[in-house]
């Protein structure tokens, strides 16, 4: 399944938006338009559904309800999220999940549910608050989604949310993970424990994935070959990626992740994540640190890998090269436009001018990206 529709009210940048989604989506917009915050709604649902998480955990991780609530919210301050999961494009939703959150007016001002609703194949199977919730209001500080004893009727949906993965790999954190002390962000979004994650994968699966990644790497970095994973016993079992770098000597030189370029590490992280699971994958600017020629191949590569594994991919981007691929449909691009009353979200296919440009032979990138440039951006060149 994949998320086919999302409706947000008072979520961060978005006062009220609705978006139809495909298995592959590219999210574009100006800086601070809310691209990362749009992805964060799915991370929030993951934080609710995962073991050890929950509604209170997800809100606390984001600094409370106030930072989550849209600044444009006025008379109706509740935060509301609705998502639909479908088996295929155009199919009726297999699942629908709705949640409304508000804050206590007095006391410790704890966030609680104004409602929680679930539909399966069009039939409503959960509608909170229930009578027991009215008798014990503390129950509304937890969702049924997060509780094993209450989510059995929609556990497949809960598992989908639990499997959501976010990746914005920071190469320096991969290279020097042991030098950064402290627990780090929940869910390891920046790849500090990326090598540990590879190490926890069963050996047969790990070797198979690394072999596939090696094939892709040799196309992008012809000098690299024989990508392997190892733990250095001399260093106390620290995990490493290692590859042979071809040069004038007959056997090349062995290099570890500390010698890999930023682009190589980010490409390894991207490919591993695409091969790793079958739930939603959230990518933050996958084009970073990569050569323009490689970036042009990302969209078709993502399509081929996700099609095999049924994985939905949502990616933010500023890259004209990434969006230059002729295989990207306007239905796969969301344009975020900041406005006085919150960011507006519109499908590129719903913009008449974009459709006309595509009909004239332009790429999605050429048709959409100029709309993301702020009106006064050219004046930056006059700054002194």
Predicted regions and their residues:
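C-terminal lobe/lid and adjacent interdomain/linker elements of RecA-like ASCE P-loop ATPase modules
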Residues: 1-2, 297-384
């Amino acid at each position: 399944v994949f998320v086919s529709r999302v409706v947000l009210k008072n979520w961060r940048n978005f006062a009220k938006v609705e978006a139809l989604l495909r298995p592959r989506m590219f999210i574009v917009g100006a800086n601070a338009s809310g691209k990362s915050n749009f992805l964060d709604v799915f991370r929030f649902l993951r934080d609710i559904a995962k073991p050890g998480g929950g509604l209170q955990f997800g809100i606390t991780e984001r600094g409370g309800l106030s930072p989550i609530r849209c600044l444009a919210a006025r008379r109706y301050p509740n935060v509301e999220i609705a998502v639909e999961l479908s088996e295929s494009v155009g199919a009726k939703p297999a699942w629908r999940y709705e949640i409304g959150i508000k804050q206590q007016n007095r006391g410790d001002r704890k966030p609680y549910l104004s409602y929680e609703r679930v539909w399966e194949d069009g039939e409503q199977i959960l509608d909170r608050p229930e009578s027991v919730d009215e008798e014990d209001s503390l129950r509304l500080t937890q969702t049924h989604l997060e509780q094993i004893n209450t989510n059995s009727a929609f556990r497949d949906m809960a598992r989908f949310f639990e499997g959501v993965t976010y990746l914005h790999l920071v190469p320096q954190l991969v290279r020097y993970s042991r030098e950064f002390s402290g627990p780090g962000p929940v869910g390891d979004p920046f790849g500090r424990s990326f090598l540990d994650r590879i190490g926890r994968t069963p050996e047969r699966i790990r070797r198979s994935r690394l072999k596939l990644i090696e094939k892709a790497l040799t196309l992008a970095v012809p000098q690299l070959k024989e990508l392997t994973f190892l733990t250095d016993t001399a260093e106390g079992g620290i995990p490493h990626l290692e590859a042979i770098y071809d040069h004038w000597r007959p056997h090349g030189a062995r290099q570890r992740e500390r010698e890999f370029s930023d682009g190589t590490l980010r490409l390894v992280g991207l490919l591993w994540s695409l091969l790793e699971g079958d739930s939603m994958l959230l990518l933050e600017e996958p084009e970073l640190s990569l050569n323009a020629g490689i970036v042009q191949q990302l969209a078709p590569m993502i399509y081929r890998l996700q099609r095999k594994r049924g994985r939905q991919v949502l990616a933010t981007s500023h890259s004209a090269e990434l969006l230059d691929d002729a295989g990207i449909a306007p239905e796969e691009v969301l344009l975020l436009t900041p406005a006085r009353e919150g960011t507006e979200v519109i499908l590129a296919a719903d913009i008449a001018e974009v459709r006309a440009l595509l009909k004239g032979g332009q790429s999605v990138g050429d048709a959409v990206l100029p709309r993301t440039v702020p009106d006064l951006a050219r004046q930056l060149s006059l700054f002194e």
